[in-house]
């Protein structure tokens, strides 16, 4: 019996090794085109506006609000060692890399500093400790970092890309023999959205205009080197988010090369049997999440390709990707009954 099982295993393994790639040589050129249309990120230096206190408020979203304390310059001239904790407000939501500088005041620094930085999109995120978080998603997604500054003066740039408006800075450790300032805090905000969408007419209801501005800013921050499903968590391309964000882009930023890149990337990283996988993780190298085929997402890829054609008239790209769209229809048809 064992020799028979071994022989069968060997046969199936051999067949798998020689399995045909449904898209053949197309896959390589699709990935090359995806790389060709990878956008350059636009980097903008943003600085905090003010120091705030986060206080409970039953009428505010998630029961916390930010109350203005002082302009940011007041923090930069203040000895920080006895202050211990402070929260700053950038005045807008940003996606990018945060940095700050420290310098001693008076006596030379004779020891390192240690800070805890907590980043929040809304006031409640920096007000409520993360300690009680029960993991559903990875705890590592929560935006807090412990930073040790071994030498003063020094500029520290966090390696992690963050999505935030508020930053809470807590001093965890310092020498009692010198004091220091924190200064020159900034975020190098990034997006691939370079065009400026048209504003809604003044006659439109002010609330609708405000919703439109927030929606456009959200889309802008999701437009990185792919359409991310969220710049704070997950940070990857899903077909469902591609459909929604590309549709919004068609009527706002109109940067269709980003849509083209995503369409080619998904095609190039599809399963060997032609199935489109629902999600692509871009870094450190693009790769698809295996065995994640969703029928509705496969069809949304086709809808996105159609929307792209209507927005651009780019028939060459559509013909290039037609085998992918056709295959998704064939796959779905095999699982749909006549009724």
Regions found by a protein language model. Name each.
Residues 1-21:
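Bacterial Sec-dependent N-terminal signal peptides
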Residues 20-229, 257-260, 273, 278-282, ...:
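Extracellular/oxidizing-compartment recognition motifs
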Residues 28-31, 35-39, 234, 252, ...:
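C-terminal capping/lid segments that line or modulate ligand- or cofactor-binding pockets
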Residues 87-90, 157, 227-239, 285-298:
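Solvent-exposed loop and edge beta-strand segments that line ligand/cofactor-binding
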Residues 95, 162-164, 240, 296-299:
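Short, solvent-exposed loop/turn segments at the edges of secondary structure
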Residues 125-137, 256-339:
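Helix-terminus loop motifs that line ligand-binding clefts
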Residues 216, 220-224, 243, 264-267, ...:
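Amphipathic, well-packed alpha-helical segments that form the structural scaffold of globular domains
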Residues 235-244, 248-253:
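Extended ligand-binding clefts on enzyme/binding-domain cores
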